[in-house]
């Protein structure tokens, strides 16, 4: 389970089940021009891309492992 939590007072939390990451990454790969091959991606690289994209949406998010 990947948990993204806001460092602000809002205490927003977003939990992403590992099984959904591939589907999410396919959508993200379209956003970044399709250069990211999700089939060949290792889990760490996928999490890094996901967190990086979430940070683009809201810079107050950080990864809480």
Curated annotation (Swiss-Prot):
State the protein's name.
Putative per-hexamer repeat protein 2
């Amino acid at each position: 389970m990947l948990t993204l939590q806001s460092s602000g007072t809002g205490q927003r939390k977003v939990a992403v089940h590992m099984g959904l990451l591939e589907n999410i990454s396919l959508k993200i790969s379209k956003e970044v021009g399709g250069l990211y091959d999700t089939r060949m991606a290792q889990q760490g690289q996928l999490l890094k891309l996901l967190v990086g994209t979430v940070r683009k949406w809201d810079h107050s998010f950080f990864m809480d492992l």
